[in-house]
Amino acid sequence: MLKNILSLMMNKFKKLNFLNIFFFIILFLILSCAEENPVRIIRLAHGLDTSHSVHKAMLKADTILNILSEGKMKIKIYPNQQLGSERECLELLQIGSLDMTKVSGAVLENFAPKLKIFGLPFLFKDKTHLFKVLDGQIGKELLEESEKYWLKGIGFYDSGSRSFYTKNKPIEKPIDLKGLKIRVQESVSAFQMVEQLGASPTPISWGELYTALQQGVVDGAENNPPSFYLSKHYEVCKYYSINEHTSIPDVLIVSTHFWNRLSDKEKEW
């Protein structure tokens, strides 16, 4: 009787052992295949609305990258300041917690001082002049400026020209700005420009600006027409005065922590 029980237990053990080995082999094969064909996800954050042309361009970039990499690399986009303000996103890149971001050159100047040049009013003759600078040697040097801070510039976005918009009166000449509280980006050059024009520069996050205008914290701001429209700031500000005082490009930035992990082929994609 005991012999039969032991024999039965041994047979069950052998069956269980065989099943364990079988499932282990299957699991090993699955993991091996996964390691051979990993999908690298690029985490990209920005502060714009999903209806903005820049966001749509990023979606297109993801489609193209997916084709070029044959599905091995994709972009996961976090719009609308989901991961923080532009400066906060740059700081996430610096510690490797985020892979890519799009920021205004005005904000990036805190990490790349040479970009302050874009804060000078009426610097460019026209768009042709601007693009010649951005696409040439000067633009290349400006993109490299922030690498010592773990931020690698890989390209510019044309963000249009900035003009003043206000709640209660149009800005037809510099004296019209005197005494007004004008929202500016986190930029020394923007702060100084508005101050020199006689207004009170007030740094406010883009995501908080609508409420600040509504509650009278500031009397106006300055930005390009698409941003003015898509943010619905026209609901609060009656006047958009087209003076196009600056043309500050946006910059696409990648964390050097992420960049240095890529192969040469992946960098080409």
Regions found by a protein language model. Give the residues of each.
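N-terminal secretory/targeting leader peptides
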Residues: 33-128, 138, 146-269
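Short, low-complexity disordered leader/linker segments with a strong preference
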Residues: 1-41
